[in-house]
Amino acid sequence: MRHLTILGSTGSIGNSTLAVVKHNPDQYTVRALVAGNNVALMTEQCLAFRPAYACMADDTAARTLKANLAAAGVATAVLSGVQAACELATLDEVDTVMAAIVGAAGLAATLAALRAGKRVLMANKESLVTCGRLFMNEARRHHARLLPVDSEHNAIFQSLPEPLQRGLGYASLAKHGVSRIVLTGSGGPFRQTPLAALATMTPEQACAHPNWSMGRKISVDSATMMNKGLEYIEARWLFNAAAEQMEVLLHPQSIIHSMVRYTDGSVLAQLGSPDMRTPIAHAMAYPERVPSGVAPLDFLRLGTLSFAQPDTARYPCLQLAVDASQQGQAATTTLNAANEIAVAAFLHGDIRFTDIAAVNRRVLEQISLPEPDSVEEVLAIDSQAREKARQSVIHFGQ
């Protein structure tokens, strides 16, 4: 029986994680749930899974949740704030932590889980985009087990030999016969939209992903392919990959989730329906397997699997991320922070779809900072980048 803390339980990944728990009640128990301000959904989750603890982002949400649970006769202890989230990520009785809080907000609790030597299921890609070196070093120092949950990184992990799985983040790809890691991406809903029309695309159109069911922020990131750019940065840290060992391909069907090229000419790929329950179930059970509730692939109904090179004119955010990864963590932290502000502004109707890349590029050009050596320095860069991005949003929104 594994005992879980779920950081980000009310988000898309958190809900899918709880679906896997529900499918395997004899294998998992939920000890703590941590979320932002979605009190209604957190109330439902506490009623269904009866965790010992629940934590909300602020006192107001926590008070409302506490009243809801008291009225329902549920004895879950309700906490609030970042420090409480960190404490729930390090509970003695918890062995596995799902790190699924979107954005920089999840950094502190994820790092706390690593320092406590937990088995950390990494779904918060921003942790590695902003703190890759620090996080990988802390995982190694405290003997924490880091398992990737993103469908692409989980696919790569499954396609790697066991010594590389054990030596995540520092083992040599070349010494174990790996020549390249191939990240695949659907290209999002605007893959075939005329370039001249991209500026007029609406948030609703950007969030209509053809294959995956995701939250609004990550849906926009998929449309710009910033999501793939962040995954590129994350993959370099997770798999100790140099730029020349990385490759990105468009794969519109989202059936092959990523691939690994070997020096003998072999290519290993992980295939599956585009459903996050599959990589979540794999990470939760590794090295064993448990049912995820996902229907198996029907190869007779699949049709054609196609591939193409990403077009940098259509996806400038992808190239910004690749370039930032070469510059270092100050640049990747800056890009991630600017992008969060830009996407929020687009979803709010303040800027156009094509302005997202323009804001990101402008902020990268305006900020030049030394490499961070601590979470505090990362957060300082993050804060500066957000302020510059807010100014840029005003500039482009005029």
Swiss-Prot record:
Protein name: 1-deoxy-D-xylulose 5-phosphate reductoisomerase
Residue numbers binding NADPH: 10-13, 36, 38, 124, 126, 215
Positions that bind Mn(2+): 150, 152, 231
Enzyme Commission code: 1.1.1.267
Quaternary structure (record): Homodimer.
NCBIfam families noted in UniProt: Dxr, PRK05447.1-1, PRK12464.1
Keyword entries, A-Z: Isoprene biosynthesis, Manganese, Metal-binding, NADP, Oxidoreductase
HAMAP family registered for this protein in UniProt: DXP_reductoisom
Cofactor(s) listed in the protein's UniProt record: Mg(2+); Mn(2+)
Catalytic activity: 2-C-methyl-D-erythritol 4-phosphate + NADP(+) = 1-deoxy-D-xylulose 5-phosphate + NADPH + H(+)
